[in-house]
């Protein structure tokens, strides 16, 4: 949603100090009118900036500074497909911005393969390896770039944990009670 009114209602309903609640904001909201300003005013809650940054290394590096200092996310996503240099530049920028602002560095999470994609989609884009092999390769790049973790479907968690143990945190967006027809997740599991 891009509705600040709707987001404010959700936050008000979850402000109880008994709850450990975090809020995930994606491109749609953070790029909406006043979206980043609104998020920067949320205090004492965990912010997950799910922006999936993917651009040339210097552009991503420069984009990280204001995100870290203004939005102050606990977690921030980048596409591993941007390459090791882009990821390393992001780690550098997040570390520097955090030090200069005396704030905690966000966890930088690399997106492996979008959970809306399946093997057929990858083949249509010219990829010659499976999703599983792609996630394996991407998780190795994330580790080399010193990311804090990765984002993958729940179907690949065991693979990543077997490869990297607890070195990389693993975030899984594809958890659904059941398949919904208006949901764009292709690779998901039920709890």
Where are these regions (language model features)?
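Conserved alpha/beta-domain cores
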Residues: 1-43, 47, 51, 57-65, ...
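Conserved anion-binding
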Residues: 59-148, 153-158, 163-167, 171, ...
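Short glycine/threonine-rich catalytic loop with a Thr-x-Gly-x-Asp
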Residues: 182-188
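Basic, amphipathic alpha-helical patches used to engage nucleic acids or provide basic targeting signals
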Residues: 191
